[in-house]
């Protein structure tokens, strides 16, 4: 009799353990809100390059600048290289300053010519979630530029956030 009681008790304990494991699994799955935090919660300014006029560097409707481009972001008189010696670039994904309301981007071309693009923007603090914290979005309010190889620049989508859309169109003269 004792053996049968122990076997029943063991089965009851096994059932209770399995029930607890299943409840814990369900509870853990319910707690996961599938938060997908962007790396460093950084929103990037996406600049698409276009050619002015006809170009042999357009393949399937996408223009690629044929030479080397280095892009520097100037903040408080200091420069940081944000894109180094890109060859065949068709788009740029560049960080935006949290503290300034105008970013100064210096484009250095391989032939020694430089251009400067001034991106005026407002900063918009954005609460992502308790897991991800805060992020900074930006609203582009204006563009100015030098005219060495940059022919013109246009705002395509003024809101710079986590979405992968083109914010600025930059028209280059070859």
Predicted ranges, named:
Residues 1-12:
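N-terminal secretory signal peptides that target proteins for export/translocation
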């Amino acid at each position: 009799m004792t053996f049968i009681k122990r076997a029943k008790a063991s089965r009851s304990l096994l059932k209770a353990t399995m029930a607890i494991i299943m409840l814990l699994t369900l509870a853990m799955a319910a707690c996961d809100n599938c938060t997908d935090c962007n790396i460093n919660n950084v929103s990037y300014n996406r600049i698409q390059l276009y050619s002015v006029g006809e170009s042999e560097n357009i393949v399937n409707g996408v223009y690629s600048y044929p030479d080397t481009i280095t892009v520097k972001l100037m903040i408080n008189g200091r420069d940081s290289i944000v894109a180094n010696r890109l060859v065949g670039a068709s788009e740029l994904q560049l960080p935006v300053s949290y503290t300034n309301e105008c970013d100064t981007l210096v484009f250095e071309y391989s032939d020694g010519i430089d251009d400067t693009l001034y991106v005026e923007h407002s900063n918009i603090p954005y609460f992502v979630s308790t897991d991800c914290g805060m992020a900074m979005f930006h609203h582009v309010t204006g563009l100015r530029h030098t005219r060495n190889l940059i022919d013109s620049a246009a705002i395509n989508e003024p809101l710079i956030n986590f979405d992968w859309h083109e914010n600025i169109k930059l028209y280059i003269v070859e």
